[in-house]
Amino acid sequence: MPLTGPVIIAANHESYLDPPFVGSSFHRPINYLARENLFSNWLSGPFLSSLNAVPVDRGGGGAKGLKIILERLMDNNAIIIFPEGTRTHDGKIKSAQAGIGLTIIKSRAPVVPVRLWTYNACGRHRRMPKLVPIAVKFGHPIHFHSLREKAGTCPRPELRNLYQQATDETMAAIAAMRPVMDRA
């Protein structure tokens, strides 16, 4: 994990435990993304703001959130993104949201893939965490130099394919990781 400069931390999303487990693993300030409506809650709003969270409109009007994310990355910050956009319903990795590739290509920040196994401890349908083993695994940074170079010269209609390729490569890197406890 780069200790300085911009970095996107891209992780699968299994439970409410994911942001603190990922964020507490780094020795630098982290910015988070959070559903916009959580900021209007009297309890979660101030808490999320204190964590440098970026409000994201999950209804599709994400241009404002994207602008804030890119600004924070330009200021050499680290930001955690959950490409799936929401927690899994069944513990399996879901497909990523459309804007992730755009964020990756435009930011020019390296992407650190992270795989979490927290579903059994506090999955979507669980109110209280269960004391079971969890795992968090960090991959090597992905730089996307060639995709970013192509994006700078390709015709506009081809950009969507490059964004999708960045998204697919990120999700494949996350899905390919296996927990340490699986090793003999």
Where on the chain are the PLM-derived regions?
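Catalytic core of membrane glycerolipid acyltransferases/transacylases, capturing the structured
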Residues: 3-61, 68
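Generic signal for short, ordered secondary-structure residues
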Residues: 1, 26-27, 48, 82-83, ...
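Short, Lys/Arg-rich amphipathic segments at extreme N-termini
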Residues: 1-4, 176
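Non-catalytic C-terminal accessory region of glycerolipid acyltransferases
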Residues: 64-184
